[in-house]
């Protein structure tokens, strides 16, 4: 016990009275990362989730006590309870914790406590934050700085989404979906872009969302640094309000770290970054798309400003294998009508879907793009309906799955049938609605052609479905 208390006192001095930490929704990407870091710091970790999966199994094998299902008795012995943003006050574990006077906090509040005693680098934005966080983490690792990192998705090069390092550096994805990133007080903040999403959090008011980002950036100390995308109109609009040092990056001629001469061949991207001092750095990436060049340049800017050598930056970016479910190639397969490539991608916002399609078009100009799209949440489908119609009309063939509700009740006019109808009326592509995913393989075999690139797109169960499809095609 003495060794445990000494360790806690050293790493997180103010949490020395905390022994057991319970996570409700421990299987989620963001929650599991923090749980894993704290488990490795020596805390007793327990947690619950509605279903067993690879993440819960891994945590259990590492020493966490994992419950499947939410029950009041699961919080017994906890010093504090960390609740996922998907968990509300009606959850039996939340109710039991409050009745027992156990503190119930958000994920970001726990992340903030871990960051408090470290040199924090927080990455926020509507799109690209998971990949950018992963890239920064790998650069610092390549530079032998042994950072702690907590990411919202798998860092493929590391084989995990979180790591407890021995240095003072903590690199973390910052979550704007519930505005909980306001708890964080980093030394460096990155904002990749700002677009309307999760608008229920902001009362449907985009101005409120922008103001919240400004508050997040003002959490930087006066000597901190904001690294912001020059290509995003909203990001540039709020930059003068930050009141901290700001450096920009992007394709824009006004960017401090400027991208030039981008070229893509298959999965590989080449470009040059012109730095504020005029230095020119040639970058090689093995992940496709201009959006990944932006992510990599944000990571490069952070690393350069913190004094990391070019050799480490370029080696890490060249070796970067991507983040989980970001243009993730599942394989090439021989089907009755020819050979096809299957790719899984997490993008579920129109902008994310758009850049994925563009990456596919740029790297594989002669291939048809066949998309399997699963809308994520009725509210997002409603709020961005017209944008989805325009973006999804860019593909050569479209299979639409039913909306992945993520706990939401259906909204009239915001379902997959309505999307299909509006896309069909636009006249560019004739979507096929597949309500029974067991029939997906059969439907695909009827429409695919030799050389097709098939994109399985969305944040819900479409990844599991597409990976099951890949396994069946291997047989």
Swiss-Prot record:
InterPro entries: Mur-like_cat_sf, Mur_ligase_C, Mur_ligase_C_dom_sf, Mur_ligase_cen, Mur_ligase_N, MurCDEF_pg_biosynth, UDP-N-AcMur_Ala_ligase_MurC. Pathway: Cell wall biogenesis; peptidoglycan biosynthesis. Gene3D superfamilies: Mur ligase, C-terminal domain, Mur-like, catalytic domain, NAD(P)-binding Rossmann-like Domain. It catalyses: UDP-N-acetyl-alpha-D-muramate + L-alanine + ATP = UDP-N-acetyl-alpha-D-muramoyl-L-alanine + ADP + phosphate + H(+). ATP binds at residues 125-131. It holds the Pfam family Mur_ligase_C. It is an enzyme of class 6 (ligase). One of its GO terms (cellular component) is cytoplasm. Keywords: ATP-binding, Cell cycle, Cell division, Cell shape, Cell wall biogenesis/degradation, Cytoplasm, Ligase, Nucleotide-binding, Peptidoglycan synthesis. Its main location: cytoplasm. Its EC number is 6.3.2.8. Coiled coil: none annotated. GO terms for biological process: cell division; cell wall organization; peptidoglycan biosynthetic process; regulation of cell shape. GO terms for molecular function: ATP binding; UDP-N-acetylmuramate-L-alanine ligase activity. It is found in: Cytoplasm. Belongs to the MurCDEF family. Cell wall formation. This is UDP-N-acetylmuramate--L-alanine ligase. It comes from Actinobacillus pleuropneumoniae serotype 5b (strain L20).
């Amino acid at each position: 016990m003495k060794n445990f208390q000494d360790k806690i006192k050293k790493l997180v001095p103010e949490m020395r009275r905390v022994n057991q930490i319970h996570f409700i929704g421990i299987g989620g990407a963001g929650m599991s990362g923090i749980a894993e870091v704290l488990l490795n710091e020596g805390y007793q970790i327990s947690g619950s989730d509605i279903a067993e999966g690879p993440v819960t199994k891994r945590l259990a094998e590492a020493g966490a006590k994992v419950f499947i299902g939410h029950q009041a008795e699961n919080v017994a012995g906890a010093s504090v309870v960390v609740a996922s943003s998907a968990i509300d006050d009606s959850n039996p574990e939340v109710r039991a914790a409050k009745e027992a006077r156990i503190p119930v906090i958000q994920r970001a509040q726990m992340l903030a406590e871990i960051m408090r005693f470290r040199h924090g680098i927080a990455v926020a934005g509507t799109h690209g934050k998971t990949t950018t966080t992963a890239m920064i983490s790998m650069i610092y690792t390549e530079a032998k700085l042994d950072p702690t990192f907590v990411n919202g998705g798998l860092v493929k090069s590391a084989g995990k989404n979180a790591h407890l390092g021995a240095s003072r550096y903590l690199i973390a994805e910052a979550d704007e979906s519930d505005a909980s990133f306001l708890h964080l007080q980093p030394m460096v903040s990155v904002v990749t872009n700002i677009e309307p999403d999760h608008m229920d959090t902001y009362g449907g008011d985009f101005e409120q969302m922008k103001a919240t980002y400004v508050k997040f950036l003002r959490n930087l100390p006066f000597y901190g640094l904001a690294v912001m995308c020059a290509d995003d109109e909203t990001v540039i609009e709020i930059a003068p309000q930050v009141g901290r040092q700001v450096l920009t990056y992007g394709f824009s001629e006004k960017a401090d770290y400027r991208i030039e001469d981008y070229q893509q061949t298959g999965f590989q991207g080449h470009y040059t970054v012109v730095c504020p001092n005029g230095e020119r750095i040639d970058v090689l990436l093995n992940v496709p798309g201009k959006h990944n060049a932006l992510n990599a340049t944000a990571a490069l800017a952070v690393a350069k400003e913190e004094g990391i050598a070019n050799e480490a930056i370029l080696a890490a970016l060249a070796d970067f294998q991507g983040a989980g479910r970001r243009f993730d190639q599942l394989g090439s397969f021989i089907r009755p009508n020819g050979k096809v490539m299957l790719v899984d991608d997490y993008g579920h916002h129109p902008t994310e879907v758009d850049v994925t399609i563009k990456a596919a078009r740029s790297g594989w100009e002669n291939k048809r793009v066949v998309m399997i799209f699963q809308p994520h949440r009725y509210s997002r489908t409603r709020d961005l309906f017209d944008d989805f119609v325009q973006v999804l009309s860019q593909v050569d063939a479209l299979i639409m799955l039913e909306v992945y509700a993520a706990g939401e009740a259906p909204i009239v006019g915001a379902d997959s049938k309505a999307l299909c109808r509006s896309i069909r009326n636009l006249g560019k592509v004739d979507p096929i609605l597949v309500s029974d995913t067991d029939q997906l393989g059969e439907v695909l075999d009827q429409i695919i052609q030799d050389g097709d690139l098939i994109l399985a797109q969305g944040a819900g169960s479409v990844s599991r479905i597409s990976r099951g499809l890949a396994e069946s095609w291997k047989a």
